[in-house]
């Protein structure tokens, strides 16, 4: 789960905020001496300082301009529940996370996304250009295995009438989808491994199965679940816009948006130990394609 590390930073940030300025009260006592709140704060600041102060500061800045609703957070949370299935709670637990702490980080990520969207050029010309190569989302099942021999074995079983969903549960090494018969979330161009995506979009009719597809993850067999014909620009504009925005939520564009928000906030760092915390966001060396359409 790519966002779990960021959630840990959220938890640490909250702890640092509570410890700041707390003084000499002991948090741990031993016969050899005590660990004070000040000592803990300084140690955590040294280890996590820059990341923590960045997230705390950006959260404060973004909350003043953008709103993330509980409904939006819950919808994002549900995606992870569905993706990880029965292993979701154990995955959170193994990373010392709770439902609440994970949702807090999802809220922060959504704030960053909204700031990035606000700085995008979503003009008609941009959308029409994007529409030329855009395709509607496609839904497929897949079976992922480590070697071609196993993939051929599955192919034979499919030809003999065995169900794709049953074979996915039995063979697929993709634990996030195997229990659900290999079903993947709908995806569009540029969202998957290029070879996998090309093979998926080449399927024409429901339940068609691809040949063996080699990707960076292993060997796949892909079954088409749903494929929608591409409509006119006027008909598809809302879908095109959503896909375009999603394609522009890159690290580069998010950083550019945060730079702009930080500059507008007139930040003043009081703690000299954290003077370089925002160096990556105040430099002018990097550029981005993200621009405001206003």
Curated annotation (Swiss-Prot):
Keywords: Cell membrane, Isomerase, Lipoprotein, Membrane, Palmitate, Rotamase, Signal. InterPro entries: Foldase_PrsA, PPIase_dom_sf, PPIase_PpiC, PrsA_foldase, Trigger_fact/SurA_dom_sf. Coiled coil: none annotated. It is an enzyme of class 5 (isomerase). It comes from Listeria monocytogenes serovar 1/2a (strain ATCC BAA-679 / EGD-e). It is a lipid-anchor. One of its GO terms (cellular component) is plasma membrane. It holds the Pfam family Rotamase_3. One of its GO terms (biological process) is protein folding. The lineage of its organism: Bacteria, Bacillati, Bacillota, Bacilli, Bacillales. This is Foldase protein PrsA 1.
